[in-house]
């Protein structure tokens, strides 16, 4: 059987904001799709064989929106698949599109990920998922009373604050170190046309002057709720070389989940008690790097986009994905190693900390890495990027996606 190497030939975005009241959901997504296909030059809507899309319908309160926006997403009379995996939705959509091409089933696949959070209430959507799981806890023998003390009670920031405290304990990081990550992200976002929070003059003191939401995380440290969409166009290696000036090859993909840490902390589960361990992220990186033939990621990866709604997570993820030694990141950020001009630039798009359309966020990470390799990013790094990483996170700090991209096909088929 022929081994097919998928490649990305174009990525598109729409403008992100807290409320895109100028468009409805279909029009919002269309902007990203049109941007993607227009940038692909010779490609037309009719050339697309299949569309794979994803969002979190409960967050908008609109069930199966892809069925009434087919005319806006090049999906009319074509196979259409929806993928939903929480915060990792975009990464899962990306990987699904990769396999749709790698399997030989389709030659050209359009991947779309989006969220229009202003249409609904994300917290209510999250609660509906959580309550469904909590309702069966007594039947499984869990002590439901102890859940009140659990980090899950604070939703996303409740989880992240526990992570932050554990990471600070491990690494001796300070609140100033967390604020430094935020400043770098928001200043990067100011140089990228589609991002949400653009703050070119933000300082560490500005961040530290904001009130606590959940210690040690302050209001100025948390991600926004964004409306936005992203689209990525996949095809085969052969077609990519014919169409694109600089095709970007998907050399490694992985998705790994382990038991939610919120169970292990205080509900009598067997999960991890330290939410910064992230063994799922370590394993996910190991699988994807193995597929891509990468033995020393800290030396072979030129650029990375990691999923970090909160600054402590950015410090944590780049360590767990093998780009830096454990507990070394606060010093690396202080020394400018992860800056745009640094040795290993991280999140030059501004990251999830600056723009968070939840369904799209995990696909925007590899999409931005693709653009860095192509030399077409909004906040392009000065060095040449040959190999890059796109990382996603979702679930109860337990579901990870890991995507390795490069300017040469190096997929290790087994």
Predicted regions and their residues:
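Glycine-rich anion/phosphate-binding loops
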Residues: 88-92
């Amino acid at each position: 059987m022929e081994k097919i190497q998928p490649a990305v030939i174009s990525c598109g975005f729409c403008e992100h904001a807290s409320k895109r009241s100028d468009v409805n959901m279909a029009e919002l997504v269309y902007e990203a799709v049109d941007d993607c296909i227009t940038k692909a030059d010779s490609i037309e809507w009719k050339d697309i064989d299949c569309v794979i899309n994803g969002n979190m319908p409960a967050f908008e309160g609109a069930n199966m929106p892809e069925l009434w926006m087919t005319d806006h997403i090049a999906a009319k009379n074509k196979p259409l698949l929806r993928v939903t995996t929480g915060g990792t939705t975009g990464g899962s959509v990306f990987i699904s599109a990769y396999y749709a091409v790698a399997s030989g089933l389709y030659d050209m696949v359009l991947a779309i990920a989006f969220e229009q959070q202003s249409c609904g209430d994300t917290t209510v959507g999250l609660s509906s998922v959580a309550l469904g799981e909590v309702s069966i806890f007594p039947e499984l023998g869990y002590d439901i009373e102890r859940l009140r003390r659990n980090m899950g009670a604070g939703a996303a920031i409740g989880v992240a604050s526990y992570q932050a405290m554990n990471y600070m304990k491990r690494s001796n990081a300070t609140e100033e170190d967390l604020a430094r990550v935020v400043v770098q992200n928001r200043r990067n976002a100011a140089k990228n046309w589609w991002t949400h929070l653009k703050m070119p003059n933000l300082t560490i003191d500005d961040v530290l002057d904001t009130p606590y939401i959940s210690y040690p995380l302050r209001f100025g440290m948390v991600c926004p709720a964004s409306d936005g969409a992203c689209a990525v166009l996949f095809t085969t290696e052969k077609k990519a070389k014919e169409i694109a000036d600089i095709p970007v090859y998907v050399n490694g993909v992985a998705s790994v989940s382990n038991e939610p840490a919120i169970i292990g902390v205080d509900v009598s589960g067997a999960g991890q008690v330290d939410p910064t361990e992230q063994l799922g992220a370590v394993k996910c990186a190991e699988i994807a790097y193995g597929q891509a033939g990468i033995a020393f990621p800290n030396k072979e990866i030129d650029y990375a986009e990691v999923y970090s709604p909160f600054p402590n997570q950015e410090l944590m993820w780049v360590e767990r994905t093998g780009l830096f030694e454990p507990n070394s990141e606060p010093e690396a950020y202080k020394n400018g190693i992860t800056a745009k001009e640094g040795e290993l630039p991280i999140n030059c798009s501004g990251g999830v900390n600056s723009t968070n359309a939840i369904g799209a966020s995990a696909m925007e990470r590899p999409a931005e890495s693709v653009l860095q390799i192509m030399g077409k990013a909004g906040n392009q790094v000065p060095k040449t990027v040959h190999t890059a990483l796109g990382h996603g996170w979702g679930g109860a700090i337990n579901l990870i996606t890991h995507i390795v991209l490069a300017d040469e096909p190096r997929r290790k088929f087994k």
